[in-house]
């Protein structure tokens, strides 16, 4: 499936923001979906990590938010890891502000799941808003957020080890695939040829 890159991410978030408010009680779903997609992308989360976040795993700090990942695919023993997501200058696309807004309207018991959805729902929500944004929803999956982060970070010249620190990859093999994708046009030999 295709990674979600910055321009597509912005289109998807705008589609969420523009969604009609006519259905009473659905406003919090809109806040959830925006926070889910922005946090998923910004943190390079796996779907399973994203849906397992509990309220007690979140700590808002002056710089942004710290999210504890208690267990993941590459951490079956449950050592845990903390992902730090800073505030973005662009408030419309800031994952920290989106998460705060959602929590303000949805706070529950500390032991409960923040997003309260299945990992399959992540893909369904993403596909739905991709279509609303005029994109081909069939080209995206829940993993598109994670691969989108890694590919975008590589496009912006972020070092391999820093991408791995955020995504939790233990080996460079997968991260290098994202970097290769990001560099298809950037380092293309045809850029040097003038016709």
Residue ranges, per PLM feature:
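Extended, non-catalytic subsegments within catalytic or DNA/protein-binding/adaptor domains
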Residues: 1-195
